[in-house]
């Protein structure tokens, strides 16, 4: 975050950039804020809740400008930033990971842990629009009712203009009765 002093460990050194793992914040920015999500520390669904919303927006705009410049050689100027809502409940699309828990003999539903394939099971997500967040528990229940739930890959949820949509990725043959 701009203005912060941190201790970090270099994890990957590329030709034009590097990656580091934060170890300790030595001097936090006065703009740093407490994340509102209880899963923030472990979940990989979002990583900018500690930034004020204005800095989140400018960071995203800079990223889009950089991509257009590097990949297409275009200077797009200052694009208009459109956000569904302020703070929480703004994300209209998500991909939920599904994992079969052999010990509990059930499907776990959540998001991938940050920088990992491990699953962080969640019951709700405050970043999602409320209609999608409310679907997480019913989706988990549905997955556990399917005969072939071990073959589920992931679920994508999208809040369209006409309501929520769900795309289920299935990696095998659906079980008898699963298509009803």
What are these regions (language model features)?
Residues 1-180:
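Accessory RNA-recognition modules of RNA-modification enzymes
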